[in-house]
Amino acid sequence: MRLILFTNSNRLCNEKQKTAGKKIMIETDVVIIGAGPCGLFTVFELGLLDMRCHLIDILDKPGGQCAELYPEKPIYDIPAYPVITGQELTDRLIEQIEPFHPVFHFGQMAESLEKSEDGKWILTTDLGTSIKATCIVIAAGGGSFVPKKPPIP
């Protein structure tokens, strides 16, 4: 399995590389915000079209709420699986996208998005990672894991 993980965490799998906090511009075809089941399946669909994907997620691992909140809970509405747990679903999706070599940026949150002069998008994370892509997919899931407090004095 060849997954490349960029993270602000010290828990890295496979290739130990870090970009967080370094001022570099990564270029790819698609940036997917969210590495839950929808984000992972998006990698598969885009991979079939030979598109390179980078995923941004605030969590330190793929799977979103399925893996983080209820990894052992049975899920009954996934096609071709009468019953599957949240972690099993995540594991199957990771296995399915392996041939497309997605790049994960864990422990980072999308902070800004702007259009460049050449018409592509530049996404910057809260840790300063910048990724230039033709397309941005928002697969942020059912809710944020980081509470946003209102600016009350």
Would you name each region that the model predicts?
Residues 3-6, 14-16, 21-31, 48-49, ...:
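FAD-binding core/adjacent interface of flavoenzyme oxidoreductases
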Residues 67-130:
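N-terminal Rossmann-like dinucleotide/flavin-binding domain of flavoprotein oxidoreductases
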Residues 28-54:
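N-terminal Rossmann-like FAD-binding beta1-loop-alpha1 element of flavoenzymes
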Residues 36-41, 65-66, 143-145:
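Gly/Ser/Thr-rich beta-alpha loop segments that engage phosphate groups in nucleotides
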Residues 59, 71, 90, 138-139:
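Generic structural signal for well-ordered secondary structure
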Residues 48-67:
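Glycine-rich FAD pyrophosphate-binding loop
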